[in-house]
Design a protein with these regions (language model features):
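Secretory/exported precursors with cleavable N-terminal leaders
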Residues: 37-40, 57-60, 120
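Substrate-binding/active-site groove segments that recognize
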Residues: 47-70
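Fungal secretory targeting signals
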Residues: 1-21
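Catalytic glycan-binding domains that act on GlcNAc-containing polysaccharides
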Residues: 42-49, 104, 121
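Extracytoplasmic
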Residues: 30, 50-52, 108-110
């Protein structure tokens, strides 16, 4: 029997994208730092609110005692960020594949939206008015400024942590850089 995991699905999609010649951009250091800030840090294995083993910056363990983690536990901060960078692959793939070739984003804009995708999930990203607006050719600064702050609820309730996260993502989105991210070559 094949065991399905979100990470396996993300890797399968990434593999298919790469096989087609698509180069998925990686989130930059500012992206990793932003996600790390809001995911929180735990160097030792702990149980998340639904009882799943978790470690580092919210890495959901796939095997007992996080046996798949290639770093010694307790994690160092450096190894925790390396693990987070690997975990971000699904959100990076999602953001790259959800946007059309007409969408031009610099590395900070892309990173802000990768953080959002990491938090809300790819299904929500793909069906969002934010992505529809970007793909329609709406001004990126306008559509993101209007739509991103609306993603501040959990269970129908405005959560202060999500309000802060969206504000930080928007600040990163508006931070200029000469480094490009999208459109990605071959995607």
């Amino acid at each position: 029997m094949v065991k399905f995991t979100v990470q396996a699905a993300a890797l399968a999609i990434i593999g298919a994208s790469v096989a087609q010649g698509c180069t998925i951009p990686k989130g930059n250091a500012a992206t990793i730092d932003l996600i790390a800030e809001f995911e929180g840090w735990r160097p030792d294995i702990y149980l998340d609110p639904v009882g799943k083993e978790t470690v580092g910056y919210g890495h959901l363990c796939q095997r007992p005692r996080c046996a798949e983690v290639p770093y010694p536990i307790p994690l160092s901060v450096e190894n925790g960020k390396a693990l987070l960078s690997t975990d971000m692959a699904g959100a990076e793939n999602c953001m790259t594949m959800a946007t059309g070739q007409n969408v031009v984003l610099n590395a900070n804009q892309y990173g802000a939206l990768v953080s959002w995708a990491f938090n809300v999930g790819c299904g929500n990203v793909r069906s969002s008015d934010l992505i529809k607006g970007l793909n329609r050719g709406d001004d990126a600064n306008t559509i993101v400024s209007q739509e991103l702050p609306l993603w501040n609820r959990g269970g129908g309730v405005v959560l202060p942590g999500l309000v802060r996260r969206r504000a930080a993502e928007l600040a990163l989105f508006k931070t200029a850089t000469g480094d490009g991210a999208l459109p990605a070559p071959g995607c």
